[in-house]
Every structure is written in C-alpha cells, then in structure tokens.
Amino acid sequence: MPGHRSKSEKKDADKQLRRDPYEVLGVLRNSTDQEIKSAYRKLALKYHPDKTANDPVAADMFKEVTFSYNILSDPEKRRQFDSAGFEAVEAESQELELDLSSLGAVNTVFAALFSKLGVPIKTSVSATILEEALNGRVSVDPLVLGQAVSKKVEKQCAHFYAVTISEEEVSAGLVCRVESSSKSKFKLLYFDQEANSGLSLALQEDSKRTGKITSAGMYFLGFPVYRLDHTINSMAQAKDPETAFFKKLDGFQQCEVTELKAGTHVFAVYGDNFFKNVSYTIQVLCAAAFTQEKEDLRSVEAQILTKRAELAKFETEYREVLVQFTDMTSRYAQEMQSIDELLKQRNEIHSAYTTIPLMKRSSSKNRMRKSSFKKAAAKAPAPTEQEEEEEEEEEEEEESSRQKNKKPSTCDKSETLKKKSKWFNLHLKLDKKKPC
C-alpha cells in the first residue's frame, strides 16, 4: 500500500512536471513582449474556465498557461528564468491574473479587501468580453477625433469606440487618453481587426492614480515611447521597501506599438472596479498641435532610461557600502567593549597597589564608632562617691559662671519693666479735703 506523499514531495513532483514557459505558450526565446502577450491571450481564451467548466484537463492547461505568462511577462522574472531556470524564480510568489467576472461574491470581497490593504492584485479582462469581441458580437460607437466623450460603464464590462485617422494624422501622431474623476479602476484596450471582422486584444493599459484622478493613455507618436508597470514595484515594496527603490524603474519598458496606420482603429474602456460602475472620459487626439510636448516626452524618457542604468550601478555600489557599514558598526561596538574592559582591568591593577583595606561607607563607620565607644564605656571602672561630688561641684560652678556672663534678653527686660510699673500704677484714693 503506497504511503501518502508529503507537501515537499508533491512540490518537487510539480517542479519536475513543469514545462518550459516558452514551450507552453508556443513562442521562441527571442519573442517580443507583444508576441508573448498575443499567444497567452489566445490560449487563455481557449482554456478559460468559463468555456470549459467541467474539463479538468483544460483547467490545468489554463493554470499552466497563466503561470508561464506570469514569468515571461515580467522582465525581471524572464531574465531570471533565462539565466537559471525555475530555481531562480520564486514560484510561490507568482501572482495570477484574476478574472473578477468569474469570482463569486465572497471571493470578490476578499480580493477587494486584500487590494485595499495594499496587496498587488492583477486583474484580467473578462474572457466573455474577449470572446464576444473576437466573434464580432460587440457594439462599437464612432468617436470623433479631438472630441471628449464621458460615460459610465458597468464593472467587468466594456465600451468600444472606433476612430478613423488619415495619413497626415498618422505622421503627426495619435494619443488616446482616458480619465476618471471618481478615481475608478479601469483598463484602456486597443484591438486589432481580424479578417472575419472580429477584434483581438492587442494592447492593454491599466489605470493609475495621478493626483486626484485615475488615468491611462496610449501614445502612438512615431518614435519609441515607454510604459511604466507599477505592479513590479508594488510587489517589491511588499517584500522589501529598500529593494523597491532600486526596482522602481524595472517596469519602465518600451511599448510594443509606436505608430498606427491610416484607417479605422478600435479602443475600449473596461470597468475594473470590484463593485461599482466606472465613470470615465475618453478622448483621441492628433498630436500635430503638441510638437513641444512630443520633444519633451522624448527627452524625459531618454533621461529615465539613463537613470535606470545608473540605478543598477548604484545598487551594486550601495550594497557594497552597506556591507562595509554593517561591518564597521559591528567593529565599533566590539572596540568600545574591548576598551572598556581594558580600562576596567587597569583600574583594578591600580587599586591592588595598597596595604590599606578598602574604605567602607560612612554609615558603617559611624556604627563602628558607636559600638566601640559603648564597649570602652562598659570596660571602664565605675567612679567613686568623692569623684562624683567633685564633678557635681564643677558643674554647679560652670552653671553659675554662665548665668553671670549671660546678657539679659529683650524678654527679660520687658518682664522687669512690668514688675516696676506695677508699683507706680497703683490706683490710690486720696481725700483732697484732708491734708497730707
């Protein structure tokens, strides 16, 4: 009868059964981020639990596809895997992308609670929305270039917009921005048009909080532009705030698409709140009137790239200095303790150069004096009667001499005056008729 396997044995077995993430997604090792993302979405849509509810094999495939994508979509984890395989990747810390539309009420509450506490939770677009878009069963509203539209979309639902651009507008550049004054969470999506009139998800930008609003944008300006994935820094912040500083720019990656072709393009706003609907404003602009802003963006992103390289070098220097500082701090404490011990030994040696016993406290000295005085008095012989009489006579003579030398005080003077005034203040009755 086979025994039960421990958790560690099961974990080792799972590691042995893992397939190469590139093999799982069907991509090459030099594939671009866009190719990896497209392959993942097709497989995730194929094996999603909403479509294969009673198929355990499909459920396992969906987990494997999601796990592989979580490695290859993260630049740092992909680099670690390419260099050292699964052992270099912290498998237990891989976050799964949650499809909130497939969660029950209880799980949604827990996910919202963890998100409120600062735990980074990745969410994905509902598989139902992606399937409907791929089959061309979504309603697409026209959007005029340069005109802002404000609406409200339900959670885990999407509003689709189509905008048509010319060759001149393509060369000038195009910008699509979405803002939410209610600080709602949403995703800005861009779809490629398939041959069967269907729409396949090509680009996705999660909203981020900027000041008093949340916003997301896509910039097609004809030159490389970059996006900042805040999730990488959030995960690093949760693990180690110090490391988070050095990983702050790890999510600064180049966007897959830098320009669009002339024609009609489809964008969508996906509600990503846990419970509430999302209020938003979407606007697609031609960048012809923003020449200076284009140059400023190109310049500042070049500086950020330089700073990212400098930050990696600075981290190495910082770690080396930190080790030295830790060593110096430890040595400081050891040297201080050693010096105190040596000075203490020196004082003890100095104190040893004497034949006099150590001094005791004053209170003990007084007690010793009193006890020795009592002992001496007890041992002395008792005085004779003649000696006692002589002592009494000497005491009387001393007392009389003190009384003579003592000056009268103010109280004594007042007493004598009172005694004298008693004689002169006698009330005598005299008869004036009789002569004295």
UniProtKB/Swiss-Prot annotation:
An example of a Gene Ontology cellular component annotation for this protein is: membrane
Q: Which UniProt keywords apply?
A: Chaperone, Coiled coil, Membrane
By its UniProt entry, which InterPro entries does this protein fall under?
DnaJ_domain, DnaJ_domain_CS, J_dom_sf, Plant_DnaJ_domain
Lineage, top-rank taxon, reads Eukaryota
Q: Where is the composition biased (Acidic residues)?
A: 385-399
PANTHER family, A to Z: CHAPERONE PROTEIN DNAJ 16, DNAJ DOMAIN (PROKARYOTIC HEAT SHOCK PROTEIN)
Protein family: Belongs to the DnaJ family. B/II subfamily.
Protein's name in the database? Chaperone protein dnaJ 16
Instruction: Tell me which species this is from.
Output: Arabidopsis thaliana
